[in-house]
């Protein structure tokens, strides 16, 4: 189910430059997945109020996205960004990382089944590339293609659309959208 409430859909406005920012991404504690996952209710955005400008090479992936084509049709994720920091919240997990190519500041958390994950993240050619266990090759990538995002997860390729703020408090278009794809 898509998150309810505009705070999930409208990211904090970013400062024009680092000199004018009020809150840096590094000043916000790293979020982790709660024991057993986050359940039915989407957690509050981690980077709310953080106005650090995105890194120059970072694609702006911020928003709530839904897979509309590919093997994971229906999957919904929220992506937050500030500076080099990226937080991806989906399927009960919160993956908070700094895209600096290190495992230390990458994702050190659990997958949706509770198994441990350790992933380095890096921005490369306007993509967010993820390297589980710091492998040489990116196993997961996200990048923009026009108004859509492409999410490659191993051999699987998915196309996502950014969801808009629900005007009636509920994302009613999600109820019938599966018929449209």
Residue ranges and their predicted role:
Residues 58, 80-83, 122-127, 143-148, ...:
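A short, structured loop/turn motif at beta-sheet edges
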Residues 87-89:
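Glycine- and aromatic-enriched membrane insertion/assembly motifs of diderm outer-membrane
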Residues 1-85, 165-181:
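Amphipathic/hydrophobic helical signal segments and adjacent flexible N-terminal regions
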Residues 64-66, 120, 159:
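Residues located in well-ordered beta-strands
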Residues 148-155:
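Short, exposed beta-strand-loop hairpins at the edges of beta-sheets
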